[in-house]
Each structure stands twice: as C-alpha cells, then as structure tokens.
Amino acid sequence: MRQFVMIGGDMRCHYLAAYLKEQGVYVTTYKVPDCEDEYSSWPMISEAFRNDSTVEERVLLLPVPVAKDGIHINGCTELAIENIAGSLTAFDFVCGGVLPSGLTDACTAAGVPYYDYMKDDCVALKNAVATAEGAIAESFMMSDINIENSKCLVTGYGRCGRVLAQKLLRMGAEVTVTARSVEACFKAEIGRASCRERV
C-alpha cells in the first residue's frame, strides 16, 4: 500500500489532499489548512511511518513553495527544513515545489529520490498564471486607479513577469519591463511592452 504524508501549505494542499482521499488514497495531513491532523507532531508522524511494515511506499508531499523564508515549511512555521531533512529515512519519495538545496542534498545523502514540481515547465507556467492574477488582484485592492491607461512597471521577465506583462497589456495598461538581459528585453518588446535593461 502507498501512503502519503502532506505537510503545511495553503488551500492548494487542502484540495490536493481532498482529491487524493476521494481517489481512495491514504493521506495523512499535518498543518494543512482546513484538514484534521491525525498526529500532534512531526516526530510522531515520521516514527509512525518509519515503523509501519504494512506500507510499501511512503511519499512525503511538501507545499509550493516548500519554504518561503528558506527555513520553515510554508504553512507550518514550527517545522524547519532541517527537521524534515533529519527524518527522510522514514520516506521513499519526496515531492515539493522549489525544494531548497539543503533538502535536496539531504535527500541525496539519504538515498531518497525527490521531485520538484516547479522543474516541470507546465506546472511552473500554470503557477506563473496564478501568481500574475494574484498580483493583479492585489493591485485592484491597493489602488484607486484603473489598470486601463495606467503606467505599470514589471520587474523581471521570467515566467511570472512575462505572464503579468501580457495580462496587463490586454487590460489596456502601458507596460514597462525591466530585465537583466538584452534577450529578455527583446522578448518583452515583441510582446508590445517597452523595456529597460537593468544594469
């Protein structure tokens, strides 16, 4: 039997846990929003999974991003990356978004395979769309002016910057992009935004 442990995160983790449970998958959640914790602490979870001989494969599902501050698990501030790294032998596979190098190094040292969702171009692009739409929603709430005919600055022209610039242009904004490379500026200008190369 395959079992999943999901830790922290935001409502995306909640919905993923609910979906997996609907599919008949055994999922243990810890500090996932609006999900009931089966265990009261991380050490209890890792020990329970390490000692359960009925489980064929133990998968640890971490949030996107794994750690916003680089130290603690996103949505679970009492749990640090080093706590997870010290318990990896309880698991057969680790998944998460933007896995910190300290965690991937620990996985490699423990012989535990890992997968970073954000290394998948399709997932990263869909995340960029959600991030861009979130930025636009924040701008609506924080500004008294319309986006149409306004001047907007987008710093960077990676996945998120590219999607954000295009959405703002479609909404009628005058968009300027700052980018580190001539190539990124060229791409921004092809997309109808003006561009200033950052030095």
Model feature map: region roles:
Residues 60-149:
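Glycine/serine-rich phosphate-binding loop and adjoining beta1-alpha1 elements at the start
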Residues 23-39, 171-189:
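NAD(P)-binding Rossmann-fold cofactor-contacting core
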Residues 4-15, 20, 146-169:
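Glycine-rich adenosine-cofactor-binding loop
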Residues 45-56, 82-86, 198:
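Short amphipathic alpha-helix with an adjacent loop that forms part of the alpha/beta core around
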Residues 2-51:
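N-terminal glycine-/charge-rich "phosphate-binding" loop or analogous flexible N-terminal tail
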Residues 27, 114-115, 175, 194:
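Hydrophobic beta-strand scaffold residues
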Residues 18, 85-86, 105, 166, ...:
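Alpha-helical segments flanking ligand/cofactor-binding loops in enzyme cores
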Residues 190-199:
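Residue-level detector of conserved catalytic or cofactor/ligand-binding positions
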